[in-house]
């Protein structure tokens, strides 16, 4: 599974989205993706890293292997990359990208090496500007010219650009906040695992998890008794039970319990330490 809007955007552009499989743990297997591209001959390949909704981070070496061995343009969607553990790059550092140590092995360091690579980043996640809809792409001149032909004129308004510029110039102010999110994320993942949940490896600002074994059975039974619904599988019912219970307690999480590849899963976004504690107490 990956970001659901890829398919929507493909449909809007009269294209067909062809998904490639991830590993059972949610990682990208370079060999599988390369073989997929050789077989399907896609016009464009998209890799979400870290992946949404599982949270997995794939190492730079794996991403480079894909870019180097496929013929089509590649979009590396790094919307959540700031949450991956790694060193930051000062905004005043103007050295070439391939000379920088970028956060958690971002593929930005490969832009000068591969002409088919585009790296997409956003201000929506780590910097909280989702409502302003400001993202950016970095790539070789040739592939960026192709992207430019598809963009509408005036696609980013002046106010959004002004806010994004100011934020980027002061992004050091966000470092402690991002560190806190990472710390709270790791605490939540560890505690959920201690409670008996299966937790997906995550390098984002969210944690995806589901019940397993006896916990699945007990939650499914509770769902059937409370809602008098025996139509769901135990795994789906366990996820629905948790989702409904949290909703009743004014806690909104993302419900993936009916998803074919994330059966029974919920995704919770990291909040303040107090909010995170409340969620864990309810669970």
Residue ranges and their predicted role:
Residues 1-47:
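PLP-dependent aminotransferase-like
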Residues 131, 203-204, 260-264:
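Short acidic/glycine-enriched loop/turn segments that link adjacent beta-strands
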Residues 27-40, 53-74, 78-124, 142:
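Active-site pre-lysine segment of PLP-dependent enzymes
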Residues 5, 116-193, 197-200:
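PLP-dependent aminotransferase class I/II
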Residues 44-48, 75, 136-138:
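Structural motif
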Residues 181-182, 186, 192-249, 266, ...:
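Conserved PLP-binding catalytic core of the aspartate aminotransferase-like
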């Amino acid at each position: 599974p990956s970001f659901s809007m890829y398919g929507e955007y493909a449909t809007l552009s009269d294209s067909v989205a062809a998904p490639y499989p991830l590993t059972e743990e949610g990682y990208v297997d370079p060999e599988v993706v390369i073989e997929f591209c050789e077989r399907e001959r896609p016009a464009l390949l998209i890799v979400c890293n870290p992946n949404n909704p599982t949270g997995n981070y794939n190492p730079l070496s794996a991403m480079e292997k894909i870019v180097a061995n496929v013929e089509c343009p590649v979009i590396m969607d790094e919307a959540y990359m700031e949450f991956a553990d790694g060193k930051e790059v000062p905004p005043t550092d103007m050295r070439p990208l391939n000379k920088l140590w970028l956060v958690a092995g971002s593929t930005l360091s490969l832009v000068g090496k591969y002409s088919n690579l585009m790296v997409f980043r956003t201000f929506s996640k780590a910097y909280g500007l989702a409502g302003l809809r400001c993202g950016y792409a970095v790539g070789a001149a040739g592939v960026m010219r192709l992207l430019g032909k598809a963009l509408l004129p005036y696609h980013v308004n002046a106010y959004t650009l002004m806010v994004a510029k100011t934020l980027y110039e002061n992004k050091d102010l966000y470092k402690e906040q991002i560190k806190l999110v990472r710390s709270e994320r790791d605490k939540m993942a560890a505690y959920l695992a201690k409670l008996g949940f299966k937790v997906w490896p995550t390098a984002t600002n969210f944690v995806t998890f589901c019940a397993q074994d006896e916990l699945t059975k007990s939650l499914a039974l509770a769902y059937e008794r409370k809602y008098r619904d025996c139509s769901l599988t135990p795994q789906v019912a366990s996820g629905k039970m948790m989702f409904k219970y949290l909703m009743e307690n004014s806690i909104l999480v993302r419900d993936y319990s009916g998803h074919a590849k994330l059966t029974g899963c919920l995704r919770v976004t990291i909040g303040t330490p107090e909010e995170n504690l409340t969620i864990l107490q309810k669970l």
